Amino acid sequence: MFLALLYLALPLADVLLSAEVSGLPGGDRLDCVKASDQCLKEQSCSTKYRTLRQCVAGKESNFSRATGLEAKDECKSAMEALKQKSLYNCRCKRGMKKEKNCLRIYWSMYQSLQGNDLLEDSPYEPVNSRLSDIFRLAPIVSVEPVLSKGNNCLDAAKACNLNDTCKRFRSAYITPCTSSTSNEICNKRKCHKALRLFFDKVPPKHSYGMLFCSCRDVACTERRRQTIVPVCSYEDREKPNCLNLQESCKKNYICRSRLADFFTNCQPESRSVSSCLKENYADCLLAYSGLIGTVMTPNYIDSSSLSVAPWCDCSNSGNDIDECRKFLNFFQDNTCLKNAIQAFGNGTDVNVWQPILPVQTTTATTTTASRLKNTGSETTNNEIPTHNDSPACANLQAQKKRKSNESVDTELCLNENAIGKDNTPGVSTSHISSENSFALPTSFYPSTPLILMTIALSLFLFLSSSVVL
């Protein structure tokens, strides 16, 4: 009898599991604009929300002088009450119609719940795309360009001109980024805005094709470096201190959010197969491109490597020199980002067939500095392996080949560290395709509450049948 009841309970458990999977990570989660509107229509939520906004804005300061702990308790009470509302878990979408307003609402909540100095949690709804999805739509960045002897970045620019959307938005940023004004080289504000629109609106198969194209020679890499018109969008008369630039970025909702997204999705992890904590190259490249058009705009440092950095340095850092270097090194020596750029240029992706060992991570309440220290001693050698070693794409594919006993293709991974040494690409051992892979997402595995619910249901049915008998 018990086995029969268990047999009946299992389909129900499967339904519950499916519901949980479909609800993660976003499910019915609202964007912050809709969540705010919904909250303001409910009297109890509206009252708590208005109180919280006053707390965030600092308008409670005069009130707190009069009532002391009572004011703090009221802020805390409002915060706890809103944790039960959809506003608590709201997110925004990059390039959405009311993005800035959405981000303002998100940060008003986040600053109250977590503090004002954190950048780790991205306010954007996860996209969870794969490079392989882009490759299926983009012949120009597939295997053929890697083997060609032409200029891939030039080919990508030509492909952009053949696409109406890409051509329109590219022209829209070229004009303000190259038009000088009376006192300045260009109007940087208009240039930045147009660049953001380009990377937000143009399909990655075209925008990434110009920004992350693989190169064999300096002419190609220099064209890649010039993609964002750095003389206007990137360079300035003087380099500010990186920590000061970070503070300026945090004062702008768009910049702060894009930087948080970059820290979240390009976090290096030396123990992972891809050198990325999240094992997703596409999300890292999306986060990186999202910074372009903000005061934290990054670009390739020179024409001989994949190292990138914002326009800043660590001079005049004083006692904060270590923190400044960690911040700057997150850009310059980021193995995850470098591997992602190289993978896109090679037409490869993370091998999701390879089982990943669990990685212990820090919580969302760690500070930016403590999060960046993970890029220290464990990742001091962050350069992409030279042609004498197997680069990330070769290592990943070799693992897949060993599982299937297939031979390893030795032609399709291009290593840009060989640029300048000779006129042939560094040879690696393989080309990766994750098109047919089916690694299960983390959200697939049942949660503890769901397991307990299933067990309780089975036990209840068993006891009920016993009473009947």
From Swiss-Prot:
GO terms for biological process: glial cell-derived neurotrophic factor receptor signaling pathway; nervous system development. SMART domains: GDNF. InterPro entries: GDNF/GAS1, GDNF_alpha, GDNF_rcpt, GDNF_rcpt_A1, Glial_neurotroph_fac_rcpt_a1/2. It holds the Pfam family GDNF. It is a lipid-anchor; GPI-anchor. The keyword DNA-binding does not apply. Sequence repeats lie at residues 28-116, 149-237, 238-341. GO terms for cellular component: external side of plasma membrane; Golgi apparatus; multivesicular body; receptor complex. Glycans are attached at residues 62, 163, 346, 405. Residues 431-469 form a propeptide. One of its GO terms (molecular function) is signaling receptor activity. It comes from the Eukaryota. Residues 1-27 form the signal peptide. A lipid is attached at residue 430 (GPI-anchor amidated serine). Coreceptor for GDNF, a neurotrophic factor that enhances survival and morphological differentiation of dopaminergic neurons and increases their high-affinity dopamine uptake. GDNF-binding leads to autophosphorylation and activation of the RET receptor. Interacts with GDNF ligand and RET: forms a 2:2:2 ternary complex composed of GDNF ligand, GFRA1 and RET receptor. Belongs to the GDNFR family. This is GDNF family receptor alpha-1.
